[in-house]
Amino acid sequence: MPFRLLLSAPAAVVEIDTGKLIRPPADSATLSGTLELDPKNPRVGLLVRWKNAAAPGEHRFAKLTLEAPGQATFTHVFDASGDIEDFLELPFPAAP
């Protein structure tokens, strides 16, 4: 499934876990590629370690956009005051 991940700040590490762990190069504010989802458990885990710590009171985000075949475009924003380590159960089935 095609994806885009927009980061609010430069990252040192990005990991996307759908049951298969991928580590896209974190050298851009926008990452894209293809995710393989587990059709029995469509979920996305995200880990973002920022290059620089956030300023006090500053929130960082990662906006994930998925283009599921036959579905409306799906967008979710992960947000945290520091590094992001979260997961999302997707509201639609993965294509078999």
Feature names for model-found ranges:
Residues 1-16, 30, 36-96:
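Beta-strand-rich recognition domains
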